[in-house]
Amino acid sequence: MRYYPQPMGKLINQLSRLPGIGPKTAQRLAFYILRLNPSEVRELSQSMIDAREKTKYCSVCNNLTEKDPCDFCSSPERDHNLICVVESPKDVIAMERTGEYKGLYHVLHGSISPIDGIGPEDIKIRNLLPRLKEGVKEVIVATDPNAEGDATAMYLARLIKPLGVKVTRIAHGLPVGGDLEYADEVTLSKALEGRREM
């Protein structure tokens, strides 16, 4: 016996495919969506379609954007001598929340993890190197404080230092094994201030 009408069962199934959404949460969300008026449902579904179709990656820094290059890369207000390397677009948001960082970004979309079979060629390092020839004086490595983040930071330092660019790593006021995106603004701000040369 089916507990739900087929369309609702399909909705619950699709919602439960999202990260962090289990069957019970998916069911709650489905019931919530069914209570919305039709225009709100259309608005919700259209916003998902728009986000998927209109969001792309910046060809310069790999961050999410609507236009290419992104607002960070094209802004004359940003410090173009400074690049902060992060693992994901969520980390860019975390850094921006501090209100302290005014440079550019480079998003790797991952970290080196030999255990998971992820090497340097599997993350977005290749387009970072040409950017360093454009007057960049410092690269701040802000990868997560875990084994993969450390491996990525060490690899980047070995790659960048011979080019004569200063390489620093954010200080570890962040919990070891934690994710940058979950750090509060004050902790992240202090970690940025206390960065050390690699």
UniProtKB/Swiss-Prot annotation:
Where does the Toprim domain lie?
Answer: 81-175
SMART domains tied to this protein: HhH1 (SM00278), TOPRIM (SM00493)
Q: Is DNA damage among the key words of this record?
A: yes
One family from Pfam that matches here is: RecR_ZnF
Annotated zinc fingers (C4-type), start-end: 58-73
Q: Which GO terms describe its molecular function?
A: DNA binding; zinc ion binding
Origin, by domain of life? Bacteria
**GO process terms (BP):** DNA recombination; DNA repair
Q: Which family does it belong to?
A: Belongs to the RecR family.
According to its UniProt entry, the function of this protein is described as:
May play a role in DNA repair. It seems to be involved in an RecBC-independent recombinational process of DNA repair. It may act with RecF and RecO.
The molecule here is called Recombination protein RecR
Native organism: Halothermothrix orenii (strain H 168 / OCM 544 / DSM 9562)
